[in-house]
Amino acid sequence: MPRKAKLTSDESDRKDQRERTEKLHMTLESADKLSETAPQHLTGEAKKMWETIVPFLNESGYVINADSSAVETLAMNYQMLREAYESVKTVGIFYKAGEKYFKNPAVGIIDSATKVIKSVGSDLGLSPQSRATLIDMANSDDEDETDWEGRFGG
């Protein structure tokens, strides 16, 4: 599997990497930014997460208003993760009912929410590797302009 493209504007990095990064920024520059005010239905930790992460995402230039449902999903799952963790801290991983021990359902919520956060966070470009993937998507438009016949002797 080939290495994912790198997002960078550092002059010490390769020229093609810098050009791809610039192209992606230019493509998204005119798009509407995310509202820094959380949707009204988000409360508590979800609202805090939205208001913390959206300024960073807007500044990054890789996320636009069309991505608001992904940011909302991230914020809601973060709140679920925090609430489930509080349950585990209070009740424990297992609880006793009668003579039997049962796994705290919050453990499953932590597992599920963590996976969603990792996946959606990656989709939003919150890891270096996922940011590099965004460049590849921006370059896919170039294929339409490529002279494939000329490239392959046709």
Language-model features: locations:
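Arg/Lys-rich, low-complexity, intrinsically disordered N-terminal tails that contact nucleic acids
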Residues: 1-48, 132-154
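Amphipathic alpha-helical protein-protein interaction segments
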Residues: 2-5, 10, 14, 74-84, ...
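Generic secondary-structure boundary/loop-capping signal
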Residues: 39, 54, 60, 107, ...
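Extended, surface-exposed interaction regions
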Residues: 16-96
